[in-house]
Amino acid sequence: MKTKILSLANEEVGEISLNEDIFAVEFIRDDIIKQVIDWQRAKAMSGNHKTKTVSEVLGTTKKPFKQKGTGNARQGSLRSVQMRGGGVAHGPRVRSHATKLPKKVRKLGLIHALSEKCAEGKLLVIDSLKLDKPKTSALVNILNKFQGKSFFVIDGNEVDINFSLAAKNIYNTVVVPQIGANVYDIIRHEYVLLSQEAVSVLEERLR
């Protein structure tokens, strides 16, 4: 499958052949894409939620009042779960939310996400992702030429430092090397910009 190579000025400068097994899968598996996104989001959760149990709450262990004769329901501790300021029963604990997902499924998710963007016409190949200076305003003007609301930019094995610094303060714009290409960011951004180097490395990686 052939597609245009664009410059950062959004002008056609050539043509490139894309591997159809990676960028033009015939049937897009939305279920696989969702599986991978759920796996990514679960893994990203901090899992540091926690409440204190009866044994962890600070306070006296003294019986609040005698067993009989007060007319109140019997109580053995002020730290019990039914008491104000007491412990929490069955509350959240610190844990990892990460789940396991086979590498083959992760790889398929990436292939189908790239194919979906390509089918929408929102995967663009750029000849070079390099800037002379790390100027945010200059990069904003460049991205405005593509008329998109959000951009996921994938470079080769290394990202140009000027391009990376210029993009840091731009809303809804993420710049990563090819190893950082992931399904969640591909789907949540409107446009995916790939350098020529990124195309060749991704094709080698996902073959």
UniProtKB/Swiss-Prot annotation:
Q: Assembly and partners?
A: Part of the 50S ribosomal subunit.
Give the family from UniProt: Belongs to the universal ribosomal protein uL4 family.
InterPro entries given in the database record: Ribosomal_uL4, Ribosomal_uL4-like, Ribosomal_uL4_dom_sf
Which organism's genome codes for this protein?
Answer: Rickettsia rickettsii (strain Sheila Smith)
A single GO BP term for this record reads: translation
Q: What is the protein named? A: Large ribosomal subunit protein uL4
Which keywords label this protein? Ribonucleoprotein, Ribosomal protein, RNA-binding, rRNA-binding
Phylogenetic lineage? Bacteria, Pseudomonadati, Pseudomonadota, Alphaproteobacteria, Rickettsiales
A single Gene Ontology molecular function, please?
structural constituent of ribosome
Q: Which GO terms describe its cellular component?
A: ribonucleoprotein complex; ribosome
